[in-house]
A protein has these predicted regions:
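Hydrophobic alpha-helical connector segments
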Residues: 71, 85-111
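Alpha-helical DNA-contacting segments of helix-turn-helix folds
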Residues: 62, 69-76, 119, 128-132
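Hydrophobic/aromatic-rich alpha-helical bundle segments in the mid-to-C-terminal region
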Residues: 117-121, 147-215
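Amphipathic alpha-helical packing segments from all-alpha helical-bundle domains
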Residues: 81-84, 104-107, 111, 125-151, ...
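Helix-turn-helix
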Residues: 25, 29, 33-67, 71
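N-terminal intrinsically disordered/low-complexity leader segments
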Residues: 1-19, 207-215
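Short, basic, alpha-helical segments at the C-terminal edge of helix-turn-helix-like DNA-binding modules
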Residues: 44, 74-81
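Short linear capping/connector segments at secondary-structure termini
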Residues: 85-90, 118-126
Length: 215
């Protein structure tokens, strides 16, 4: 290999390393900007200023503001969806895995609090703004199936919507609150116990109401 080729390879490696460093600076800066202002109000110049890079360097790394948001959120979304799928299958096969699944999910969300908050509350105006609604609909479907199983009929849709909204709000409080991982896991377990007991009491009440209406 000639000296010229060696020099070219070294230069290429150095350029790649600088580009990666620039991208990481922009991702850190963008994460903070999106968390503070939300996607719609986040300013590219402020992101670049905080990262100490030029706007030209930004566009060399990312096509636009949404591409930066994608670099921040896509991996977390992929991991979250994979974990939900794996955990659902595990619990179906062995309900005793629920506590361990809850722990793993809380550990992951604790490590990615900022991304979770941006995704659920700060992504309006981006292609991710429907993610919260998607989660909401999935939970409504799961709640409806569960209630139907024990009631023999479909529950009131508005009741399910409110119950899901309350459950999601509880999860967001855990994510946003200044808790340790262990505290989040404990609180999630206690909230779950309360929710399970309340759900069964509600189903019993609703079944009783059905009997009253029959008479």
């Amino acid at each position: 290999m000639t000296k010229r080729l060696v020099h070219a390879n070294i230069t290429s490696v150095m350029n790649d390393e600088r580009r990666k460093q620039t991208e990481q600076k922009l991702i850190r800066s963008g994460r903070a900007e999106f968390l503070e202002k939300g996607y719609a109000k986040a300013n590219l110049r402020d992101i670049c200023k905080a990262a100490r890079v030029t706007t030209g360097a930004f566009y060399f790394s990312f096509e636009n503001k949404e591409a930066l948001l994608a670099a921040i959120l896509d991996l977390v979304i992929t991991d979250y969806q994979r974990m939900c799928s794996v955990f659902a299958k595990r619990e179906e096969d062995d309900p005793g895995t629920a506590d361990d699944n809850e722990r793993q999910m809380m550990e992951y969300l604790s490590a990615h609090r900022t991304e979770a908050i941006i995704l659920m509350e700060k992504s309006a105006g981006s292609r991710y703004e429907g993610f919260k609604s998607q989660i909401d609909m999935q939970m409504q479907s799961a709640f409806t199936s569960y209630f139907s199983k024990f009631m023999g009929v479909s529950p009131d849709a508005e009741l399910i919507r409110i119950l899901v909204s309350m459950r999601l709000q509880g999860y967001m409080e855990l994510i946003k609150g200044d808790y340790t991982v262990e505290e989040r896991i404990r609180l999630a377990r206690e909230i779950g116990i309360h929710a399970d007991a309340g759900t069964m009491a509600l189903i019993k009440y609703l079944n009783g109401q059905k009997e009253v209406y029959r008479k």
